[in-house]
């Protein structure tokens, strides 16, 4: 289980507070202006026609607000929401049980929708297109099919891996929206909003310091704020200034560009052991004692996005920007 402070994945201990931090309406939702603006138009149009909203696919890196947007869609449409995840729907009966509880207009949110089996996908197709469910019971010559009518509903699917969705499933979504990494000023606004909910006083500069180290991800920004709050509480203050915030983050080994100890170890190994690369993924994994899949799925995306690392046909290479950040250029000179 990935328990990195800078992990974009949801961590179990965050459940109790996370829901209370989530915005409930578009006007409270910071960032993702393009996706938010388009969704708002589609929702208003559906309401004007007294129709259900088309099925929506949200994709992008973890921690950017896909689950929150699904809840906001339901709130803005004035309907209920049922929430599940791809791995939880193992058998046709699991899907039938969920679909049979939907009220007219409800939102069904399926997180990690790319992890649905092909069998479940095929049952989902008529449910999405014709609002009906075909259930087969019995085997061989005794097999019988029963069609169950469903109320109109909106399926909101969320995935971090849109490419893993089958084309037939992907094509049945009328609305497809990509969520992008957040800008620093957007994350600073999120940190300030969360601090207010925590009844903390935080300066704009301190919010900015936390935002810069949050890897473009609200989930990480809120997690870092929780840890900075711990340092503030032990120091006997409810006021977070830039000095306190920066000191706390330094002690947590999160540098000014949002890199932690694992990132440092990976990038330094590439320079000090392999001259900056190219180096193969398996070789790099063995060198730093990490799983190759974990490096590829968890560590690399941010390093690639920020220009610290590049992939080539011959392997991974560190960039000049990364060398400058770690001071290797000066040493070479």
Swiss-Prot record:
Keyword Ubl conjugation (UniProt): no
Database matches in Pfam families: AAA_lid_4, RuvB_C, RuvB_N
Gene Ontology CC annotations of this record: cytoplasm; Holliday junction resolvase complex
Keywords for the protein's UniProt record, in alphabetical order: ATP-binding, Cytoplasm, DNA damage, DNA recombination, DNA repair, DNA-binding, Hydrolase, Nucleotide-binding
Positions bound to DNA: 311, 316
Gene Ontology MF: a single term: four-way junction helicase activity
Region (Large ATPase domain (RuvB-L)): 1-182
Matching InterPro entries: AAA+_ATPase, AAA_lid_4, DNA_helicase_Holl-junc_RuvB, P-loop_NTPase, RuvB-like_N, RuvB_C, WH-like_DNA-bd_sf, WH_DNA-bd_sf
UniProt-annotated binding residues for ATP: 21-22, 63, 66-68, 129-131, 172, 182, 219
Protein localization: Cytoplasm
Free-text comment on this protein's domains from its UniProt entry: Has 3 domains, the large (RuvB-L) and small ATPase (RuvB-S) domains and the C-terminal head (RuvB-H) domain. The head domain binds DNA, while the ATPase domains jointly bind ATP, ADP or are empty depending on the state of the subunit in the translocation cycle. During a single DNA translocation step the structure of each domain remains the same, but their relative positions change.
Functional note: The RuvA-RuvB-RuvC complex processes Holliday junction (HJ) DNA during genetic recombination and DNA repair, while the RuvA-RuvB complex plays an important role in the rescue of blocked DNA replication forks via replication fork reversal (RFR). RuvA specifically binds to HJ cruciform DNA, conferring on it an open structure. The RuvB hexamer acts as an ATP-dependent pump, pulling dsDNA into and through the RuvAB complex. RuvB forms 2 homohexamers on either side of HJ DNA bound by 1 or 2 RuvA tetramers; 4 subunits per hexamer contact DNA at a time.
Protein name: Holliday junction branch migration complex subunit RuvB
Source organism: Exiguobacterium sp. (strain ATCC BAA-1283 / AT1b)
